[in-house]
Amino acid sequence: IDRNFGGSVLLIGGLSLGGQILLEMLSRRKDLCRFAMVESAAVIPSKLTYSLIKPAFGSCYELIRQKWFSKLQFRSLRMKPELFNDYYQDTCGITKQNMIAFLQESSMYFMKKSLGECVAEIHLFVGERENKRILFSARKLHETLEKSNLHILPTMYHGEFSINHTDLYVKELCA
């Protein structure tokens, strides 16, 4: 962004971990972009989740590489069936250490106070059927960010908006 775009861009979007990364960027650079789209980003740390990740993935990591298990996991994410092959390839490409590291970091992410100084117009998207931690995070972000708009998406689960409803997502981008 600094080298190729003079230090700021029109819009940045992020889903889940990508949303956390975007929020971290905005907390460090209040004028990084004019608009931001944050979907399903958790900003409430969970020590319990953090402590369970290493033993859970330590014992079942090899299962993730099994296609039958990966299909079960994929179905639980409620993604379009035609995305499975990409999902499977991407998942198999992540090392055990990296998967544990990014899941643990994500589970402990918290909103920085400096995020409140962000000047971007931020659109927060969260599925109505997401877990409580994600829903509370969206509300907390909305309360903190003066120029934010909270969109609670009826009947949607985690990540469904940008992954399964790309047409609606693009309409929001263009709005």
Predicted regions span which residues?
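Short beta-strand/loop motif that positions the catalytic acidic residue
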Residues: 118, 124-126
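Flexible "cap/lid" loop of the alpha/beta hydrolase fold
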Residues: 27-28, 33-63
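Short beta-strand immediately N-terminal to the catalytic nucleophile in serine-hydrolase-like folds
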Residues: 12-14, 39
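Gly/Ala-rich beta-loop-alpha elbow adjacent to hydrolase catalytic centers
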Residues: 14-18, 22
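Conserved alpha/beta-hydrolase catalytic His-Asp/Glu region
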Residues: 48-49, 63-116
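Conserved acidic catalytic loop of the alpha/beta-hydrolase fold
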Residues: 1-10
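Conserved alpha/beta-hydrolase "acid-adjacent" motif
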Residues: 131-137
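Catalytic histidine-centered segment of alpha/beta-hydrolase-like enzymes
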Residues: 156-168
